[in-house]
Amino acid sequence: MGSHGTWPGTAGECSGYLVTSGSFHLWLDAGTGTFARLQEHVTPGEIDAVLITHGHADHFLDVIPAFYARHYGDLGQAGLPFYSPAGFMDLAALLVSENGRNVMAEAYAFDHLDAGRVVEVGPFRVTAFEMTHIGVYSLGYRIEVNGHTLAYTGDTGPCDEVIELAQGADLFLCEATYQDPMDHTFFHLSAEQAAEIAAQAEVRRLVLTHLTPALDPGVSLEQAAGVFDGPIDVATRDAVWEIGR
């Protein structure tokens, strides 16, 4: 639904993905603009759970309009399962409150995750991995269902944990914020670095995401293809992948 990093652009929203198995719908990250896109696929009441990687706005901010839709629009049940890194609820409470009441906690059933935790979310088995990022505690998730695996980095720089996260995944959804080697930091990846991780982890398919709107995705794709010889895509707002097919 959204795949841009840092800010949304005319061609796409910030990070946000709909992961579906059968009739179960998991909203994976909720970056700016993704709630509107989500409603092109499901109603707010059809969202069964939310899974957030970290507390940066381009990955979570649209849980706020989703909250208002549920709280004031009577769109969906109270207590929607909501999984996020430890401390996220405190941030959410700062953004939305009514006379000191943490009304977010009334709409969502928060479950705070730490690295190594494994939770069953509907049909999905979700394992949390600590990523290397800046400013906040950031997790990546390995999501398994019916013998197939989606690995999602959220935001990260190079680290051993991201290789472990991706190991043997059917689909590796990996951030690729940069193209210029001079832009490399310890807190994000380039397309080339994403491809190196994909090759080391022996994933089946690499999907580059979190490109800033200013980048030409064709360049990122070309850079990654020079390193990883498996199938590579760049995430777009309308892209759909059927994992295991």
Task: Indicate residue ranges for each PLM-predicted region.
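Cap/insert and terminal regions of metallo-dependent hydrolase folds
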Residues: 157-245
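Hydrophobic packing residues within well-ordered alpha-helices of enzyme cores
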Residues: 38, 63-66, 92-95, 162, ...
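Active-site neighborhood of phospho(di)ester-bond hydrolases with catalytic His/Asp-centered motifs
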Residues: 27-31, 48-55, 85, 151-154, ...
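Conserved beta-strand hairpin/beta-sheet module of binuclear metal-dependent hydrolase folds
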Residues: 1-45, 138-154, 171
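Active-site-proximal loop/helix segment associated with metal-binding centers of metalloenzymes
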Residues: 8-12, 103-105, 112-177
